[in-house]
Amino acid sequence: EETAQKVYDNLDFQRGVQAYLSSIQIASMAGMRKGMLNFGPANTTVLLFENLMDSKALWLTPNTVSIYMAMWLELGDEPMVIETPPNVLGIIDDHWFNYVADFGNAGPDKGKGGKFLIIPPGYKGDIPKGYHVAHTKTYGHWVIWRGSQVNGDTAPAVNTTKKIFRVYPLSQKGNPPEMNFINVSGKFHNTIHRMDYEIFEEINEVVQAEPAEGQNPELLGLLASIGIKKGQPFEPDARMKKILTEAADVGAVTVRALAARPREDKFYYYPGESVWATPFPGGSHEFIEDGAVVIDGRAYFHFYATGITPAMTSKMVGKGSQYAMAYTDADGKSLDGWKVLEKYDYERHGKVRVEDGRLVLEKGEPATGVRYEGK
């Protein structure tokens, strides 16, 4: 009996760690939803960073140059219309953190803005013409887009969004509700997932809110094995809570190790030559390579980053985005956030050339650097 109990304790611990690593993206979306809805209800509340992003906004991987705008979309039993502005990079991800649609420069509207129709799970009604149609498997969605400054001015992008962006049920197209645009620059808020035991609480929130058909049955089975099951309360007893607390601690240090010290060549742009790593090992926004999920790549991405779209992995010059990251310097020493780091001296090292608007990586001596080629 004692041996069997130890075996089951170990089994529950293993499943807790794997549930953490395989579901961190779900918790991330739960954190995003909570942080955004603190400012107002879904569908009518739009967060605008009119004065750009700052340290009071706890987000994953934002920059302080783009003009971020975001809202939480909650579907019901009918399609929802989203009227989008031009000249933005916009994405819609579902509650499981799966890609639904692009809009703007990388979308079907080709940067001109347009009307998108988001079809909820199980909808059997007619779908009218005149919309960019996207089918989804969840009710909750994260909608985010970013505009660009014009000669250092954020107003053109902000004002265009306020004038054009609308969200409403299809049945209300003749009388759409008013949108509430909130400037959240300088306002403290947190959209980041938990890293401790409470990450399981966040995962449970999404499992309870969404149809099971939208998620992988294998993953749902893993979550059910630790007590997270749709239609049932997540109430682990003292023994199980202790095990899951330890599992979360191990999961947290594991994803940090995956991010800071990737051990597979596929994580690096130039294995053995450079520390610059790709956010999408395997080259897929779905984290799939040769038919198999890149499990470590998915976990490490969703630990530190946010936003899923094929535009981040496709080489869409002038439209999409390409990213590189590094946790160490060229000598493999960890970057220390408590220290002041010197900017890359491109004049001395000759690593920056001005050409055609692409962000690429350059190999060479002295250390590998980032080369910006742009007008």
PLM regions and their residue ranges:
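A compositional/structural signature for long, glycine/proline-rich flexible linkers
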Residues: 1-330
